[in-house]
Amino acid sequence: MNKRVYISADYDEGSGDRNVVEELNKWSTDNYHKVDFVDMAKVVSGSVSENSDCRKCDLKSEFNSQINASSAVIFVIGDKTASRTAGSGCERMYKEWFLCNCAPYKHNSSGLKTCKHMNTSPSDPNGDFDYINSCSYLRHEFEQAKKRRKKIIVVYNSLYKRESWLPSYMCEYKDVAVPFWVYDSCGNKVGNYQFIKKQLGYE
């Protein structure tokens, strides 16, 4: 049975962790690895971002929906993950809507606009992580997965454990986070499919 798994990673062109995401996505296109991966880049490039007035909060709301529909979330940790701030900066939690300005998502070029949330309410303690927040996209995804009690799998984009790469909000996972890359019996660098498979309950 295929499982839907959400991938959260740093997609920076020059120093991100796309190589891990590409390896994971390869597993979902063959007849051997029965996993349906949904990576953040696909969500960002989807219909919600095509709206000319798409804001950070709209993307976070869509991330919530995609995570809710997934059975597990894989967080790919690279050497720049802890310092990434994309998605942060919203001030709506502290100011009235007419005092807050934000830019539509970067695919659009409409410039700064006044916040569109005139009214807000406390988030449901049993519901989603509030999409109106000052978190980065990466932290938002983590908080949503944790609040929704999803299976969380943390891997380093490395052949070795890199605890210093973990963002502070993920410190509780330092003992269970593992390197994504391993050497096979022929000395080739490959993704640790056996670990991912076990974490997803396939054995």
Model-assigned labels for residue ranges:
Residues M1-V73, I77, L200-E203:
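Conserved N-terminal substructure of TIR/SEFIR domains
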Residues R4, Y156-E203:
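C-terminal interaction surface of TIR/SEFIR-family domains
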Residues G14-D17, A82-A86, K161-P167:
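Short catalytic/ligand-binding loop motif for oxyanion handling, primarily in non-cytosolic enzymes
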Residues N31-E62, D79-E91, F98-K116, S123-I132:
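Conserved BB-loop
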Residues Q66, E141-Q144:
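Hydrophobic/aromatic ligand-binding patch that stacks against planar heteroaromatic rings
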Residues G78-D79, S158:
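Flexible loop residues that form catalytic
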Residues S136:
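Winged helix-turn-helix DNA-binding recognition segment
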Residues K147-I152:
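A short helix->loop->beta-strand "cap" motif at the edges of active sites that frequently abuts
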